[in-house]
């Protein structure tokens, strides 16, 4: 299990171990080109392929993509229907490619809201790539940060119905979070110009570096990822410490690997 950044100082590197992305701007990309919004979503799938490949080639261990939030059900029915079809198309076409590249696919969120067919396709995709040792790509679908915390609390109490309130700690709750298998994101990226986290990974983003770009998701490519990584390398990641404590020769802080 990965240690919480609020309990210990995690190991860091020039390349982020875990990158989380809100893929925003598909609709606006299409509108500015006088195209239907669906065209933006289709083009966005190309950007997903590029992001996965770029992350894999740069040594990222975990890439988490916010594909569909629990609030996205409020969108027009036609758009939701198209997104579901696009999701199934992506699962059919991309899983074998991911598997051939040694990439593992995981999907997190309240999957009960999806059709039985989509749920089956998700299970099959996860099973097919389960033993792959490379990059883990997580698709957050019908996911919300508040949902994640609530479902973790419910699962904890279901497993330990007699647990005392004082025993409900970060260490106790963390194994029940949807992304318990991954380290906390080092770098959060949001495309499309908005500057908010939109109920995404509220628990896990506690000490993530937040990078916002005006570029719409369909235009996101390896060069834009490199710009985000260059910005990340210039960040001073203190995790509650002072800058002076980061100077060479100072006493080492507790490490997650200690």
UniProtKB/Swiss-Prot annotation:
Pfam families referenced in this protein's UniProt entry, alphabetically: Prenyltransf (PF01255)
Any GO BP annotation: polyprenol biosynthetic process
KW Magnesium (keyword) present: yes
Keyword Cell membrane: no
Cofactor: binding comment: Binds 2 magnesium ions per subunit.
Binding site for substrate: 25-29, 37, 41, 69-71, 73, 75, 190, 196-198
Molecular function GO labels: ditrans,polycis-undecaprenyl-diphosphate synthase [(2E,6E)-farnesyl-diphosphate specific] activity; magnesium ion binding
Gene Ontology cellular component list: cytosol
Active site: 24, 72
Binding site for Mg(2+): 24, 209
Record-linked InterPro entries: UPP_synth-like, UPP_synth-like_CS, UPP_synth-like_sf
SUBUNIT field: Homodimer.
NCBIfam families hit by this protein: uppS (TIGR00055)
Protein's job: Catalyzes the condensation of isopentenyl diphosphate (IPP) with allylic pyrophosphates generating different type of terpenoids.
Protein name (record): Isoprenyl transferase
Encoding gene per record: uppS
């Amino acid at each position: 299990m990965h240690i919480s950044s609020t309990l210990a100082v995690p190991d860091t590197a020039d390349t982020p171990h875990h990158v989380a992305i809100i893929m925003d701007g598909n609709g606006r990309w299409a509108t500015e080109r006088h195209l239907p919004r669906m065209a933006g979503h289709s083009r966005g799938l190309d950007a997903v392929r590029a992001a996965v490949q770029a992350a894999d080639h740069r040594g990222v261990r975990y890439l988490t993509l916010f594909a569909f939030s629990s609030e996205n059900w409020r969108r027009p029915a036609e758009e939701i229907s198209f997104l579901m079809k696009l999701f199934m198309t992506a699962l059919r076409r991309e899983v074998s490619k991911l598997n051939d590249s040694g990439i593992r696919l995981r999907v997190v969120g309240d999957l009960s809201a999806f059709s039985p067919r989509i749920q089956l396709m998700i299970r099959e995709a996860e099973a097919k790539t389960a033993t792959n040792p490379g990059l883990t790509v997580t698709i957050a679908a019908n996911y919300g940060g508040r949902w994640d915390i609530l479902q973790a609390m419910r699962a904890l109490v279901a497993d330990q119905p007699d647990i005392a309130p004082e025993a409900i700690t970060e260490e106790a709750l963390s194994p029940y979070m949807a992304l318990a298998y991954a380290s906390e994101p080092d770098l959060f990226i949001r495309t499309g110009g908005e500057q908010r986290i939109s109920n995404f990974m509220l628990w896990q983003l506690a000490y993530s570096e937040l990078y916002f770009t005006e570029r719409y998701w369909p235009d996101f490519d390896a060069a834009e990822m490199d710009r985000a990584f260059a910005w990340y390398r210039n960040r001073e990641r203190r995790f509650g410490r002072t800058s002076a404590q980061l100077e060479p020769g100072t006493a080492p802080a507790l490490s997650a690997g200690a």
